[in-house]
Amino acid sequence: MNILDIAIILVLIMSAIIGFKRGAIKEIVSLVGIIVVLILAFAFKGVLGNVLCKWLPFFNFTGSLEGVKVLNILFYQVIAFLIIYSLLFSVYMIIVKISGVVQKIVHMTIILWLPSKVIGAIVAFITGYVMIFVVLLALLIPLKNTDVFINSKFANYIVFETPILASSSENISTSINEIYSLGEDLSKGNISTNEANVETMDVLLKYKIISPKTARQLIVLDKLDGISGLDKVIEKYE
């Protein structure tokens, strides 16, 4: 167990304690709201991500993926997800505050007080778990090959094996895994930087992180200048 595992446990415990204090109604509204926010964020991240890719600068990554420009596409998709999630989360917080009024009425009823507290703790634990999943997924690009993530007993399970959540983000997490494998080949000299860029594009198209149309638009905008062989990869998915 490392520091990341300890942080995860503390967040889950604190979530349950807060849920016990807040009660069932507020926590159920909270959990449903987060799930809806997640679904909408995943649904619309592609549209915003494509806009960000086209009009914001591409970065030069360091480390094993140095020179892999195409990785910027995945980076901006994650940023787009976080932007949409944050905006929707703000709306959801307003709804949670409104639900607090209903919760106060429930607490005035002695018979419902304790069950509400217990259910609130359970639901809040689940909500905390979902929030941890979102944070780990957002940090997957910088954390993936770090010792703290690799040696964590809980982080890998949460991101890659959690029922429903893992399958909903499978395209992103799987593409990151495959791209990091390409990074290892690149650092060992098994493939060139150009080949790493081309194969990364293939991964992003295969998992529908980007559409062939957007990929061609990025080429026209000179965002992927200096990379040869992209046309053949894009043609495979048109």
Please provide the spans of the model-predicted regions.
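Alpha-helical transmembrane segments and their juxtamembrane interface "caps"
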Residues: 1-238
